[in-house]
From Swiss-Prot:
The keyword Aminoacyl-tRNA synthetase is assigned to this record: no
Modified sites of kind Phosphoserine: S27
Lineage of producing organism: Eukaryota, Metazoa, Chordata, Craniata, Vertebrata
UniProt tissue specificity: Expressed in the embryonic heart at E11.5.
Record-given protein name: Inactive ADP-ribosyltransferase ARH2
Molecular function (Gene Ontology), one example: magnesium ion binding
One of the GO BP terms on file: cardiac myofibril assembly
């Protein structure tokens, strides 16, 4: 149970740090690195809600987790619950610098329409990171290998509610799968290629449930190709390849260049394929070193709130809170609620439903 709580907490810690990084980038306060040097580094930092608020990444992840921990009878009821919570949540997001795709996607949801509540049209603008950052808890709820089919369906439908574009909703499948792999104890180096093996099952599900699959097809291959390229770059694409390879020079400046290269628009982590990719890359490089993870996933020149949310949550599932300074989570915004959701997800994941 402790790792479930840690995952919910550290996802939000990663969000607060990454979101704070973006806010400070765009202000006269100076960079987050300068601020940390003055205050004594991450060990001395206290994330208080006033100075280090969370963004919409945390708020939407909590909304997903809250829906997953209700007493729903069937998946359609779960989807109606998600729709209701997303629509209620999005009305409160204006001060949280929300992902525009999330706002637009929620505007298409119909909580009062019993049959069509979560059915939204294909969206060219739905490729953003917001589907990926709200789906780790789905992998926590359905982490067992025998629940893979449910994980695929729920993560895709959850993603499509707000990001009905393969680059968007395959991001939610990806982060849900990664969370399940962490809890299964699957070696980290295998996660990317195991995720690619699941994509045909996801495509099969979409063919059965999406009426006009043709407009999705081209974008589908984009997500897959980007991940294949990444895994080949790190030399972990094939089953026999279990040693990750990084460039000799991979400092902050080089990482920013690489993150931009992986993106589709020059801002690392902006889309559903590269937000999980940057988080995964950071986890591969950092091991159990929390400070190193922050340097790679929370403090970069792209969408560091999104990548920080994903990386923090997965780190919690892998390593718990042992190496994380207490100041980062003891006063964290929504701390009690996050811990309660982690406990509820743990309890429900051990029961059959």
């Amino acid at each position: 149970m402790e790792k479930f709580k840690a995952a919910m907490l550290l996802g939000s810690v990663g969000d607060a740090l990454g979101y704070g990084n973006i806010c400070r980038e765009n202000s006269v306060l100076g960079s987050i690195q300068e601020e940390l040097q003055k205050t004594g580094g991450l060990d001395s930092l206290v994330l208080s809600p006033g100075r280090w608020p969370v963004s919409d990444n945390t708020i939407m992840h909590m909304a997903t987790a809250e829906a997953l921990t209700t007493d729903y009878w069937c998946l359609d009821d779960l989807y109606r619950e998600m729709v209701k919570r997303y629509v209620e949540t999005v009305e409160t997001l204006s001060e949280h610098r929300p992902d525009p795709s999330t706002i637009e996607g929620c505007s298409q949801l119909k909580p009062d329409n019993y049959l069509l509540a979560w059915h939204t049209p294909f969206s060219e603008k739905g490729s953003g990171f917001g589907a990926a950052t709200k789906a780790m808890c789905i992998g926590m709820r359905y982490w067992k290998p025998e629940r893979l089919e449910t994980l695929i369906e729920v993560s895709i439908e959850c993603g499509r509610m707000t990001h009905n574009h393969p680059t968007g909703f395959l991001g939610s499948l990806c982060t849900a799968l990664f969370a399940s792999y962490a809890l299964q104890g699957k070696p980290l180096v295998q996660w990317g290629r195991e995720m690619l093996k699941v994509l045909p099952l996801a495509e099969e599900y979409c063919r059965k449930t999406i009426r006009h699959m043709a407009e999705y097809q081209e974008h589908w291959f984009y997500f897959e190709a980007k991940w294949q390229f990444y895994l080949e770059e790190r030399k972990i694409r094939e089953d026999a390849e279990d040693k990750v390879t990084f460039p000799d020079n991979y400092d902050a400046e080089e990482r920013d260049k690489t993150y931009k290269k992986w993106s589709s628009e020059g801002r690392g982590g902006r889309r559903g394929h590269d937000a999980p990719m940057i988080a995964y890359d950071a986890l591969l490089a950092s091991g159990s070193n929390w400070t190193e993870l922050c340097q790679r996933a929370m403090f970069h020149g792209g969408e560091s709130g999104a990548t920080g949310t994903i990386a923090g949550c997965l780190f919690g599932l892998l390593h718990g809170l042992a190496t994380v300074p207490r100041g980062l989570y003891q006063e964290l915004e929504h701390k009690g609620r996050l811990e309660d959701l982690g406990a509820a997800l743990h309890r429900l994941s051990t029961e059959e439903k």
